Regions:
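Hydrophobic alpha-helical connector segments
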Residues: 57, 71-97, 151-158
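Short hydrophobic/aromatic patch on the recognition helix
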Residues: 38-48
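Hydrophobic/aromatic residues within well-ordered alpha-helical segments
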Residues: 8, 51, 58, 62-66, ...
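Hydrophobic/aromatic-rich alpha-helical bundle segments in the mid-to-C-terminal region
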Residues: 106, 118, 122, 140-187
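Amphipathic alpha-helical segments used for helix-helix packing
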Residues: 96-116
Length: 192
């Protein structure tokens, strides 16, 4: 059982993530969550003021993980094109390893929840797009991609690709692996 401060909070977030991994994609209710944890709903509200706060905790985990990995990629990889490929691959792999989080990233789990949650996901996707744009700009100066190509449009296309693969994965009940065709598709998307 969770004894230390913060341990119960983490247990609640992990349980929400596990519930989101169910292929049927049922709505998460505090009653169902409390039952799964063998707690009262009141006990849940001692740790989180609202269900929206629980989703904010999951989004915070996603942001910390994704941007931590992006920072590592951009620091270690000197090629702009390799940065771009590694970031897209990481985003697809993150979904593959964190199925429940994929439903948060696609907004599927946020339907009928506080709209600020979807805004936060949108802001995260905008930050990812800006990072891809920087990597593509670097690739253009390094002669790895066409220097006259519109890097903003290219970065947007890559984000659309990633979110589309996330959607396919979530909507298929997690059977369509987001990385399944990535090697062939990366050659098309990155002009390799």
């Amino acid at each position: 059982m969770a004894n230390k401060p913060g341990e119960r909070k983490l247990q609640i977030l992990q349980t929400v993530a596990q519930m989101l991994e169910q292929p049927k994609g049922e709505k998460i209710t505090t009653a169902a969550l409390a039952a799964r944890l063998e707690l009262s709903e009141a006990a849940l509200y001692r740790h989180f003021a609202s269900k929206a706060q629980m989703f904010e905790g999951l989004i915070e985990f996603i942001e910390q993980t994704v941007f931590g990995l992006i920072n590592k990629i951009t620091q270690e990889e000197k090629s702009g094109l390799q940065q771009t490929e590694a970031i897209v691959s990481m985003l697809l792999g993150f979904a593959q390893k964190n199925r429940g989080m994929t439903r948060v990233l696609t907004g599927d789990a946020l339907v009928n929840e506080d709209e600020r949650l979807q805004r936060r996901i949108n802001q995260m996707l905008d930050r990812i797009e800006a990072t891809l744009k920087q990597s593509l700009r670097m690739a253009a100066t390094q002669g790895e991609v066409n220097a006259t190509a519109e890097v903003g449009a290219h970065a947007n296309l890559l984000v659309c690709y990633v979110t589309g693969r996330w959607q396919q994965f979530a909507k298929s009940g997690f059977t369509r692996d987001p990385l399944a065709q990535w090697p062939a598709q990366s050659a098309i998307l990155l002009g390799k």
